[in-house]
Amino acid sequence: MSLPATFDLTPEDAQLLLAANTHLGARNVQVHQEPYVFNARPDGVHVINVGKTWEKLVLAARIIAAIPNPEDVVAISSRTYGQRAVLKFAAHTGATPIAGRFTPGSFTNYITRSFKEPRLVIVTDPRLDAQAIKEASYVNIPVIALTDLDSPSEFVDVAIPCNNRGKHSIGLIWYLLAREVLRLRGALVDRTQPWSIMPDLYFYRNPEEVEQVAEEAAAAEEGEEEEVKEEVTEGQAEATEWAEENADNVEW
């Protein structure tokens, strides 16, 4: 698929894709994913063609940008590593996020409270999000999916070949997808100008690590406050001693 020059993969984006291990696929290759295989390593891991990944990512972004109402786009991730990325993608593009368990009947049972009628569905893993893809096929909703080389591709209209198991790879794909959508909508005018949002914002963070960092920051603040109090106390004590000495030396 040939793209206009403005959509070409830049060296910076290629380095990001490689650094996040987006190109590392599975050992097994599904028949529909064979065109995306670049090579195979001696250990059996297949390498994904990053150029193909970028082409499909741009195609997906153009489809998303063509939806007039951003809320009609539903971003889904049952995988833990993709839930933060889905929420950030929805916050930046205006899409509707479903992070966590997908409630069966959300697309087909209009009686349920979580019923939705989207025009486009984006999933992180076709295997874990199979229920959403199946229901989308019942009501003729197109599906965009992040697919590994061994992922099933039934009822998937646009497959973005990538490593959909690593937290950095998943976060980076959602980040690049959001950035390209904003550029196509005109929110980011100049394509040469970098986006102010960093990819790290889309990466999964362990709640225990976040709590530990918060506790360390709170302990550091308490230590600084205690040091300030000690300095103030020492200063007051010195001032009191100086006043007493001067009072003794005063001759009335």
Curated annotation (Swiss-Prot):
The keyword Ribonucleoprotein applies. It comes from the Eukaryota. Keywords: Acetylation, Cytoplasm, Ribonucleoprotein, Ribosomal protein, Ribosome biogenesis, rRNA processing. Transmembrane segments: none annotated. GO terms for cellular component: cytosol; cytosolic small ribosomal subunit. Belongs to the universal ribosomal protein uS2 family. This is Small ribosomal subunit protein uS2B. It comes from Saccharomyces cerevisiae (strain ATCC 204508 / S288c).
